[in-house]
């Protein structure tokens, strides 16, 4: 059951119905049960591992009330990470182990996959533990409440990464049925379906065509630039579409989840990009990795001794560069133990560190030529530059192998003019094909991208859903019905492989 | 309350729109016999896979012997589907005999895209839901294909599968009625003049070694289960069940022996048209009679097989020759046969 | 005390005193790099220890909230 399946919609409807029929005091139990049932339906016996993770996280958080906290926190993180590696990379431990896990999960060895969302549970759980350790939240005494926080079903598949202080209270307090919340939640989900099923589904076909399904591409040169741009757009539509579905679903229950995207393509610098893209992961890394390091005694000591030698600014820059390296190492490893993720992480780290290094000269330049650097043209330049600096990272993340992926990139230079003009070729069978899509799908892709641009632009100024609620019922219903029908007709679903998300794999 | 009423109205409008889309986008691959016109005076029914609709021509049997019957089959139909199809059919008609195509034992859960055709024809009922459930359930030997697991929603809501046929509307290629292949059908028989020459030079009923490929020749537990259900169903409706295997060069001696033993154990008649005596009597011309494989025949091959079957029925069954008695549906059968002849004699 | 804090903040990043919103850390006016400088300077100036737990978006929302943090740690 993925978030874009009919079965999920039926499941969600049933959960919402039971939720609002239950007195507010008991609603969190309904959510907890729904989360467990959801997990069971998706991952069957792997539910055990969810319970195991939650159990470890609960016990350790309780133990922070006394004793040697620091050692315990490190021990907990180590245990969770080892467990995660064992589950995610079961193949390393031999066929026997995979078969053992398959027995637990009641799944055939062939369809073996790591327990659903366990990476997100890990981040959420570590965040909670560190918060308790730091004393910013108190350890929850009721295990079921911790479990309900960790397993909240809309968010468990791909985040957002929740904070205990933000979510737990909302889960526990109970909510009165609100027609507006229901309608707004459904509308937000609908928009997610447009992004995921109509746009990302087609972008994925284009991406696979351009990269030759990552098996060796017949394209080169300028097409590679296009491929890189398509990869990043594909991740964005896929992932942010999923977030719309997740956040919309939570909204129906009266629960507000943190946003994970905030118009990242308008960012004017790389640090800003990471405050707008996968926001909750960025904040998690900043709060639990970056600050854990830079505020630690050794880091402070280092800063102090460097200050005297190289000056305040440089000392801080050096310490923060080490912090940045930690952050991106964790970022890369969290996505998977593979060269491609480490390369992507190294790429982003390089950009950020580069930014730190040139920060002072840039500041001087800016104060010297304020008219120029504050002009609209320069700001647009910054946005475009950030966009083009940022997008190769998405390509690096998606490519399955370092060597072949980089070889493809290299054809920008080695075979630059090989294919420059978009060529329309006759595909097998019927119809004209453009970048792997027939003319109908291509038209739908272009039209839906235009629609996305219009809606996003409108939404930046004022919530599109409020705009909708202010217009007359006839055009409003016409628009909504048209979007639903468009998703039904133009969505990429119904096939075996459709409906899986990129970020579900991490 | 007012808001709730509005929400219900919205959902209703949406449901109507979706139902409308479902109707225009669902391909109609009807090639089944028109049981309304055939009426309930039916001597036999042949049920099973494509080997049925590419081998048995009921109009020829009518012309030869005056027996009435029809084909009830689906490409690569597994026994699960055959069982539910037959169950629904026996509520409408009462044949004397059901001939069960043994090729169905070669499949377990079938192929989702084919199963879909049978399911789309079934109105919603408890049996349909049971069938959908059965097709998605894994047996202990894991015979199920992945696509079947994920097709439940397609079976239930055809629009889920066929939604992207909107392109065919714009392309002007939407064929709402027939699959091209099923254009000329007569009482469930699919007539074609296509021509195919089988290249492998082995004899009929080859051993696995002679055939040069290995197959599972035993009957799976799943098929045994559904065979027993079919058997019980026939007993309940007082219908005789006969196993039939139409000619096929891919039908192995080993499978034949297994099936023969199985039929003996179950106390059933087993007509295997691949046996040497039958093949000689059929006088199949391997250069002329196949349509797209060695188990599918064009009109020339099917006439031979159907004539043989008519003779076999005359000697083994005691159906009445309805041409002599003259019943209400004679005109329809004469019309069907004339229709078939017209197709056969038409210049391409 | 407020003047001292303001002076430190201004030296690290001139944009901080001009900022009128309520999310210095959240909006990225104070970057992770600045945090190191600010914390180090505040620690030296006021003889306090600022730990990771204190680096929250609430504590680093406005100049006032930073002052309140310093006060609470003294």
Model-predicted regions and their roles:
Chain C
Residues 10-29, 47-56:
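Phosphopantetheine carrier-protein modules
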Residues 32:
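Catalytic nucleophile serine of serine hydrolases
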């Amino acid at each position: 059951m993925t978030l874009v399946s009919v079965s999920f919609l039926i499941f969600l409807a049933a959960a919402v119905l039971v939720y609002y029929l239950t007195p507010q005091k008991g609603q969190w139990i309904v959510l907890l049960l729904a989360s467990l049932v959801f997990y069971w339906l998706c991952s069957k016996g792997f539910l055990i591992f969810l319970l195991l993770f939650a159990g470890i996280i609960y016990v350790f958080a309780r133990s922070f009330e006394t004793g040697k906290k620091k050692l315990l926190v490190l021990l907990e993180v180590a245990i969770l990470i080892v467990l995660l590696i064992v589950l995610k990379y079961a193949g390393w431990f031999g066929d026997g182990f995979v078969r053992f896990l398959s027995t637990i999960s009641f799944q055939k060895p062939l369809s073996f996959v790591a327990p659903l969302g366990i990476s997100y549970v890990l981040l959420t759980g570590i965040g909670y533990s560190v918060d308790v350790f730091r004393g910013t939240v108190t350890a929850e005494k009721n295990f079921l409440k911790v479990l309900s926080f960790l397993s909240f079903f809309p968010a468990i598949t791909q985040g957002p990464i929740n904070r205990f202080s933000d979510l737990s209270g909302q889960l526990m307090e109970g909510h009165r049925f609100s027609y507006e919340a229901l309608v707004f939640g459904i509308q937000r989900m609908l928009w997610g379906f447009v992004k995921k099923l109509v746009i990302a589904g087609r972008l994925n076909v284009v991406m696979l065509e351009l990269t030759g399904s990552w098996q060796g591409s017949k394209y080169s040169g300028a097409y590679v630039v296009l491929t890189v741009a398509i990869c990043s757009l594909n991740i964005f539509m896929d992932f942010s579409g999923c977030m719309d579905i997740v956040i919309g679903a939570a909204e129906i229950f009266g629960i507000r989840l943190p946003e994970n995207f905030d118009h990242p393509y308008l960012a004017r610098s790389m640090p800003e990009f990471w405050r707008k893209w996968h926001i909750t992961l960025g904040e998690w890394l900043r709060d639990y990795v970056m600050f854990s390091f830079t505020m630690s005694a050794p880091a402070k000591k280092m800063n102090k001794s460097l200050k005297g030698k190289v000056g305040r600014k440089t000392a801080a820059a050096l310490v923060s560069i080490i912090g940045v390296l930690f952050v991106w190492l964790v970022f890369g490893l969290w996505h998977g133990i593979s060269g491609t993720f480490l390369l992507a992480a190294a790429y982003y780290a390089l950009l950020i560190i580069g930014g730190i290094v040139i920060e002072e000269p840039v500041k001087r330049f800016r104060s010297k030529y304020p008219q120029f650097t504050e002009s609209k043209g320069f700001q647009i330049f910054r946005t475009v530059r950030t966009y083009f600096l940022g997008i190769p990272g998405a390509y690096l993340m998606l490519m399955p192998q370092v060597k072949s992926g980089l070889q493809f990139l290299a054809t920008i230079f080695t075979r630059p003019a090989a294919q420059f003009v978009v060529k329309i070729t006759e595909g097998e069978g019927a119809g004209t094909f453009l970048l792997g899509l027939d003319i109908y799908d291509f038209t739908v892709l272009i039209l839906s991208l235009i629609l996305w641009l219009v809606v996003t632009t409108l939404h930046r100024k004022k919530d599109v859903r409020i705009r909708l609620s202010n217009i007359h019922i006839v055009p409003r219903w016409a628009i909504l019905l048209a979007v639903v029908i468009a998703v039904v007709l133009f969505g990429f679903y119904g096939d075996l492989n459709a409906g899986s998300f990129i970020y579900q794999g991490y | 309350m007012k808001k709730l009423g509005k929400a219900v109205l919205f959902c209703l409008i949406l449901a109507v729109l979706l139902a409308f889309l479902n109707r225009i986008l669902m391909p109609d691959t009807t090639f089944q016999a028109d049981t309304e016109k055939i009426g309930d005076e039916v001597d036999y029914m042949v049920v099973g896979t494509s080997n049925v609709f590419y081998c048995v021509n009921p109009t020829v049997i009518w012309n030869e012997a005056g027996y009435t019957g029809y084909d009830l089959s689906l490409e690569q139909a597994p026994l699960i589907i055959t069982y539910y199809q037959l169950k629904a059919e026996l509520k409408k008609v009462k044949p004397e005999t059901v001939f069960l195509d043994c090729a169905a034992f070669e499949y377990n859960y079938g192929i989702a895209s084919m199963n879909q055709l049978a399911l789309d024809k079934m109105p919603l009922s408890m049996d349909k839901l049971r069938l959908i459930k059965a097709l998605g359930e894994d047996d202990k030997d894991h015979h199920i294909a992945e696509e079947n697991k994920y097709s439940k929603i397609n079976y239930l809501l055809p629009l889920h599968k066929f939604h992207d046929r909107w392109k065919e509307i714009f392309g002007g290629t939407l064929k709402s009625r027939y699959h091209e292949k099923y254009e000329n059908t007569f009482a469930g028989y699919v007539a074609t003049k296509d021509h195919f020459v089988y290249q492998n030079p082995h004899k009929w009923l080859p051993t696995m070694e002679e055939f040069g490929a290995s197959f599972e020749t035993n009957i799976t537990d799943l098929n045994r289960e559904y065979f027993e259900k079919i058997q019980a169903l026939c007993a309940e409706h007082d219908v005789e069940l006969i196993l039939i295997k139409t000619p096929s060069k891919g039908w192995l001696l080993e499978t034949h022996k297994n099936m023969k033993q199985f039929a003996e154990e179950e106390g059933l008649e087993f007509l295997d048209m691949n046996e040497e005596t039958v093949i000689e009597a059929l006088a199949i011309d391997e250069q002329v009679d196949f349509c797209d494989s060695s188990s599918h025949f064009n009109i020339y091959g099917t006439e031979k097989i159907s004539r043989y079957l008519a003779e076999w029925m005359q000697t083994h069954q005691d159906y009445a020759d309805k041409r002599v008695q003259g019943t209400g549906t004679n005109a329809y059968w004469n019309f069907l046969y004339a229709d078939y002849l017209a197709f056969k004699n038409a210049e391409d | 005390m407020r003047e001292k804090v303001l002076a430190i903040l201004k030296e690290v990043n001139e944009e901080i005193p001009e900022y009128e919103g309520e999310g210095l850390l959240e909006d990225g006016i104070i970057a992770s790099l600045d945090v190191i400088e600010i914390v180090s300077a505040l620690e030296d100036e006021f003889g306090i220890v600022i730990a990771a737990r204190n680096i929250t978006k609430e504590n680093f929302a406005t100049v006032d909230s930073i002052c309140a943090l310093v006060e609470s740690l003294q």
